[in-house]
Amino acid sequence: MISNLFKSLRLTIAFCLFFSVFYIFVLWLFAQVAGPNKGNAELVTLNGKVVGAANIGQNFTQDIYFWGRPSHAGDGYDASSSAGSNKGPSNEEHLALLEERIDTFLVHHPYLTREKVPAEIITASSSGLDPHISPKAAYAQAKRVADARGWSEEKVMGIVNSHVEKPLLGMFGTEKVNVLKLNVALDQASNNKFLISQLDLGYEIIRKKSSSLGSCILNGIFYVG
């Protein structure tokens, strides 16, 4: 019996060392060698000012910008509280929130019907940090952004198309658009009116909490619908 107890104890210690030291080291080493930006946050600058991290979504609500996915991570896009809502598809509170988001989206996009509202725009990702939307979700917002900026829809669509990222190696993930990079490109095309750099986007929170290695790697490689 004592012998079995020591075997169990040794096995427990071995697993603790493996998963808390060796496994973490292997992930870190992989990120340093093969991960985007060596597993660190990809900082995005505009007019000499850091406006966010490309690996972590932000809450854009103005009509002149494209909107990303909702977030249930902390107060929103908090890498230290990465999570979804964990509410089931039949949860009444969840369904009411979806209806509210659909109504809000349609107020700003009256040219769309309820059936045309992109599902990803009203549903949060499992990480709560997703910085990407699909090209389809961006196209649905193009007219609203164009009208708000006084541009032609074709001009906005051209900027969107130039920011569509292909699947990794042509097979991993799907096509995606980084919302922050897209919005920065809009401002860069706005006769030097760098609007994002004037916004309080909570970058200090992002800077301090964007060391969530797993989320940064996954969001940098895949688009998770």
Regions found by a protein language model. Give the residues of each.
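Short acidic/glycine-rich loops and adjacent helix/strand connectors
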Residues: 221
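Extracytoplasmic/periplasmic C-terminal soluble domains
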Residues: 140, 144-199, 203-205, 217, ...
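Solvent-exposed alpha-helical segments within well-ordered globular domains of core cellular machineries
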Residues: 3, 96, 100-103, 158, ...
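Flexible, solvent-exposed loop/hinge segments and secondary-structure transition points
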Residues: 7, 20, 27-148, 164-167
